[in-house]
């Protein structure tokens, strides 16, 4: 059957001290981007790839893959910006700080197809 789901543009942050805080809405919906989202040394939060919903018209067998664009939220002025394309679009994958960079491990290339790759990401 046809997938029924709604991707949201909402963005939220959580701290134990303050609970949930609503951030400015993203310019377009993104789900399943690498988590936790990488944060640069100057406080910019990055959403790298993920599912933008454009593949929902496809079956898992014909889906071309996930979004290769990235967004960033500049926490100094709380505005979203286009952060450009990424080399390896993925969704549903962990991301962690590693040796001064970020490691994005495995993830889905397209629905139902996992990647064995590990990517190292350097942020400005």
PLM feature segments, named:
Residues 1-124:
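Kelch-like beta-propeller repeat domains
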């Amino acid at each position: 059957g046809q997938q029924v789901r709604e991707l949201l543009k909402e963005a939220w942050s959580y701290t134990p001290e303050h609970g949930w805080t609503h951030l400015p809405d993203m310019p377009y919906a993104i789900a399943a981007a690498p988590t936790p989202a990488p944060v640069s040394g100057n406080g910019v939060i990055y959403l790298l790839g993920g599912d933008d919903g454009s593949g929902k018209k496809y079956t898992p067998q014909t889906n071309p893959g996930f979004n290769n664009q990235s967004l960033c939220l500049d926490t100094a002025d709380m505005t979203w910006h286009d952060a450009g394309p990424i080399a390896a679009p993925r969704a549903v994958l962990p991301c962690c700080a590693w040796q001064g960079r970020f490691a994005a491990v495995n993830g889905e290339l397209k629905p139902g197809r996992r990647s064995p790759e590990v990517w190292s990401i350097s942020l400005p």
